[in-house]
A protein has these predicted regions:
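Residue-level detector of high-confidence beta-strand sites
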Residues: 67-70
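Alpha-helix N-cap recognition
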Residues: 31-37
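Short beta-strand scaffold segments in enzyme catalytic cores
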Residues: 54-58, 63, 135-138
Length: 166
């Protein structure tokens, strides 16, 4: 346990205590993440969500899952990429995938989705730590859109409805 002494505004002193606890957690994804099918657990959960949600999935250089962060209530129009990169750096990730749900039930990329994709594409060009943007997946009821597979840059997925290119 670490203790740190602080002074209060009125000159009073107090002792702040905190403890670091290590726990074992089973990762929701095992092995490599190379296409949307590898993220099935996340995709399935997002299909029935009624609240907008963005999930950042963080990977190492070998496409192995390191962790994820859920941003509740976020949409493509409101998402702050700076917060996303905070977690990216904390996990020492090298690659990332963005999962976003469309509660409307339509997995077609919106204008705001396209803007967010372009923002991430611009970010990876200028950031000094050179993150690799692996995919942007939009999940809707019974369908999803994958930027990578619709661009031809990743493995083919049989669950695709749209072939929009960016």
């Amino acid at each position: 346990m670490n203790n740190e002494e602080h002074k209060h505004e009125e000159g009073k002193r107090y002792l702040k205590k905190f403890e670091i606890v290590e726990t074992e957690v089973e990762l929701p994804i095992q092995g490599q993440v190379r296409d949307p099918e590898d993220l099935y657990a996340f995709l399935k959960d997002l299909e029935s969500e009624h609240v907008p949600k963005i999930i950042g999935v963080y990977l190492d250089q070998n496409h192995l899952f390191l962790g994820h962060q859920v941003f509740l209530g976020q949409t493509s129009a409101t998402f702050d990429t700076q917060v996303f990169y905070h977690y990216y750096l904390m996990l020492l990730a090298k690659r990332f995938v963005i999962l976003i749900n469309h509660p409307s039930g339509d997995s077609t990329p919106t204008e705001d989705d396209v803007k967010l994709i372009k923002k991430f594409q611009a970010d990876v060009q200028v950031l000094s730590f050179k993150p690799f943007f692996s995919d942007f997946i939009i999940v809707a009821k019974k369908s999803y859109f994958s930027m990578a597979t619709n661009d031809g840059t990743a493995g083919h997925s049989g669950n695709q409805e749209h072939t929009t290119k960016f």
